[in-house]
């Protein structure tokens, strides 16, 4: 679930809104469901060690609020870590992190289990799962790059190598929302309003299928 903290704060201007929203989410997924919240930190790519209890999330205040309360639920992926709650915690927590968008990565499991992606008060181009689709399609504007670094596990530092599908410097590889918005429909890729913001939801398998189809016709569908 991707989120924009301004969506919570438009009604309750304190972190109480974070706690209320989280409790609603947990109740909504029930015992058989799983909630995954991105807690990404890109400092590993700049030579910094990753510590899941201390490395802050760089993707929003809500995610850092949850890290402070539930850091034990955070994965050890040094770049694209997630907080995981629910039935699939063990399976997702044990995913391989040597290749960010690889066949054994957490993103591959999102597709396998057909997760529902929710963009709460943020645009659909924020979905990191789109980079996984880019990887599977082998788009021309990205390439595999190896990053060496350390992660802290049980008070000990471990040296690891991570393969990350990064964008080429000579092109603006930022995902744009224009073409994605054209894929929205009332059934499988939905748009709903929440106060003054828009929210989006789509299943991973459906998103992967329609975006791959578009990329097969135009490699630059997501960025131009």
Show the residue positions of the predicted features.
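N-terminal and secondary-structure boundary signal
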Residues: 2-224
């Amino acid at each position: 679930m991707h989120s924009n903290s301004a969506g919570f704060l438009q009604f309750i201007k304190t972190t109480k809104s974070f706690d209320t929203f989280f409790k609603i989410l947990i109740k909504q997924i029930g015992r058989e469901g799983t909630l995954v919240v991105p807690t990404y930190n890109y400092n590993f790519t700049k030579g910094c060690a990753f510590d899941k209890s201390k490395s802050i999330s760089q993707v929003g205040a809500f995610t850092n609020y949850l890290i402070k309360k539930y850091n034990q639920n955070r994965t050890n992926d040094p770049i694209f870590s997630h907080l995981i709650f629910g039935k699939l915690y063990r399976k997702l927590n044990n995913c391989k992190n040597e290749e960010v968008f690889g066949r054994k990565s957490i993103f591959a499991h999102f597709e396998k289990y057909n997760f529902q992606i929710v963009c709460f008060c943020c645009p659909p181009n924020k979905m990191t799962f789109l980079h996984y689709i880019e990887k599977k399609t082998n788009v021309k504007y990205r390439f595999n790059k190896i990053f060496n670094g350390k992660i802290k596990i049980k008070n000990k530092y471990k040296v690891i190598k991570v393969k990350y599908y990064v964008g080429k410097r000579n092109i603006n590889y930022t995902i744009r929302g224009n073409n994605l918005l054209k894929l929205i429909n009332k059934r499988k890729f939905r748009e709903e309003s929440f106060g003054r913001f828009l929210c989006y939801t789509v299943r991973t398998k459906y998103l992967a299928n329609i975006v791959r189809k578009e990329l097969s016709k135009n490699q630059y569908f997501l960025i131009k």
